Amino acid sequence: MPINKRPSDEFIALLRKSGDADINVAAAAQREFAKALELPLRKGVLVGNILGNIFETINVEAGSTTEFPLDLVSPGLEGEHVAYTNPGHGRIPERSVEGDYVMIPTYSITSSVDYLLRYAREARWDIVGRAMQVMEAGFTKKMNDDGWHTLLAAGVDRNILVYDADATGGLFSKRLVSLMQTVMRRNSGGNSASVGRGRLTDMYVSPEALEDVRNWGLDQVDEVTRREIYTAAGDGAPITRIFGVNLHDLDELGEGQQYQDFFTNDLGGAVQASDLELVVGLDQSTSDSFVMPVKEQLQVFEDPALHRQQRAGYYGFAELGFGVLDNRRVILGSF
């Protein structure tokens, strides 16, 4: 609900009824109000986040298991699946393969918000709209953190950290992008013509890394690229792609920031000795690794227990989970 735009007259009337002195009228209006909020909140939670469409949403029926099959070929064993020269006699060798699976646990996430009934009676849609934004932000923040914690854990489990040994510590360089591309290719399995082979498509960096890009001189980029950096909009990366890799900036990445602290303090990871910041690279060329099973879509309900306190409130919950089926799609770097 945008707080700088007046909603429809029907919405204003429903908001007034939700604060009616008749508790039965208020309860019915609050129930209808909750359902009216459910769809826009659900859209906001699924779209307005920094997961950037990384995870594929998979709706799962209630009561069913969230099992996902893994690739028949395990990482590091690609070379064992070969053909043989047939000498013309004897039996053809047998090679049995059996796929494994992983079960991703789902869990419930909840949030709530309440405000004075007086705001409803006076149709203060700006205050109510802000309250709904706070509720949406609670869900979004939870999903952002859980999704990125899963990605970082997959990167740490891979036990590969790429860094540019020739660059100054704390300075983002083009060579780091190139090195991460090469390491991703070398460690993705298969050969040059393998189908679905991993490659670096997206890189997530801190705002300070983009500041380094803005300060690249003529010894780093040509004059045309310098012009593009100079005229780039302030709400995005100064260069959106380097060597075909999409650049994304996250406030949560950077020295002393939330996700880097999670990487070092909770996961026990560490950047290169002379480096300061973490970089996350992903392969999003295929949707075969990052999954978000959803067992129960976001639902919003009114809270009738708050009427005695002369307040109106709403709460919501959803059941979902996050998983990385193949950690070869994640690579970490530092600068």
Question: Where are the predicted features?
Answer:
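Sequence/fold signature of self-assembling virion shell proteins
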Residues: 2-5, 12, 216-335
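A contiguous, surface-oriented mixed alpha/beta subdomain in the mid-to-C-terminal portion of proteins
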Residues: 177, 181-248
